[in-house]
């Protein structure tokens, strides 16, 4: 019985340690197809390698929030998380697209601009 209690306590200690480990998110912004002005496309913001799982991801057009869909939260073998936020868009020369990420590991929101040449 004492061995069981010790194992449970060690398990709880391990689980509490998982929350203490923090990893900053890696942000990638890209389109599904090569960019062509005036041609519909999909804009993706892939955020990976972060912990804890609470995160806010916003796709933006000229600094304003775009309506977007988000995949379910998933995790890697190392218990860091990843998400994909995506939306349809039609690129133009004048418009600037970006992805803004808020996470507890960041002192300020991380903004990554879409590079149409990628």
From Swiss-Prot:
SMART domains referenced in this protein's UniProt entry, alphabetically: IGc1
Protein origin, superkingdom: Eukaryota
UniProt KW Cell membrane keyword: no
Gene3D superfamilies hit by this protein: Immunoglobulins (2.60.40.10)
InterPro entries: B2Microglobulin (IPR015707), Ig-like_dom (IPR007110), Ig-like_dom_sf (IPR036179), Ig-like_fold (IPR013783), Ig/MHC_CS (IPR003006), Ig_C1-set (IPR003597), MHC/Immunoglobulin (IPR050160)
SUPFAM superfamilies to which the protein is assigned, alphabetical: Immunoglobulin (SSF48726)
Family annotation (Pfam families): C1-set (PF07654)
Keyword Signal: yes
Location of the protein in the cell: Secreted
One example of a Gene Ontology biological process annotation: antigen processing and presentation of exogenous peptide antigen via MHC class II
GO MF: MHC class II protein complex binding; peptide antigen binding
Main localisation: secreted
Domain Ig-like C1-type residues, every copy: 25-113
Subunit structure: Heterodimer of an alpha chain and a beta chain. Beta-2-microglobulin is the beta-chain of major histocompatibility complex class I molecules.
UniProt family annotation: Belongs to the beta-2-microglobulin family.
Main function: Component of the class I major histocompatibility complex (MHC). Involved in the presentation of peptide antigens to the immune system.
Protein name stated in the entry: Beta-2-microglobulin
Organism placement in taxonomy: Eukaryota, Metazoa, Chordata, Craniata, Vertebrata
